[in-house]
Amino acid sequence: MKRFIIGLLFLSCVFTQGVKIFISADLEGVVGAVTGEQLGPGGFEYQRFREFMTGEVNAAIEAARSAGASEILVADSHGNGQNLLIEKLPKDVKVIRSWPRPLGMMEGIDGSFDGVIFTGYHSSTDNKEGVRAHTFSSSRLTSVKVNGKTMTEGSWNAAIAGEFGVPVIMVAGDDAAVK
């Protein structure tokens, strides 16, 4: 949580007026996420963790606005893509939900954005320090590597943003993901 707050404070110092921000929101890396019961519609704590996810996204939105963001797009990128409590998001924020998406967790990104924020991110399957570590779908993938380097969902999505010339300006997630 401390790193998340520090990241938000840093973000508030980065931009001037009129910037456009893309937020990719995942759930496994939100504060307190430790079991599958918290992460899917059938889980007894799922509704509570939807609240946490939405709260972290709203904190990122608030920080981006404090730093001058005038347009924000949020991609609900966990599981079925229908996790954020959209009624609790600011009305002028655009949200991408559900699937299919040609760019996956980065659907909607293009070169018009000034920065990308990742919330709720987690480490890869290869990182044993991660609590909910996986890479995209652990039932289908155990590891993704590019030129011999292990890719996390975050590094993969950062590469997609980079393809459009958009920098990742903040990552919030579990300890293993943000190291």
Could you describe each region identified by the protein language model?
Residues 3-13:
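Sec-dependent N-terminal signal peptides
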Residues 14-21:
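Boundary at the C-terminal end of the N-terminal hydrophobic targeting segment
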Residues 39-59:
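Short catalytic helix/loop segments, enriched in acidic residues and glycine
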Residues 74-83:
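Acidic helix-start/capping segments at beta-turn-to-alpha-helix junctions
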Residues 91-109:
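A glycine-rich helix N-cap at a beta->alpha junction
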Residues 123-137, 145-149:
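Conserved mixed alpha/beta catalytic, RNA-binding, or beta-rich assembly cores of soluble enzyme
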Residues 138-164, 170-173:
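Active-site glycine-rich loop that binds ribose-phosphate moieties when present
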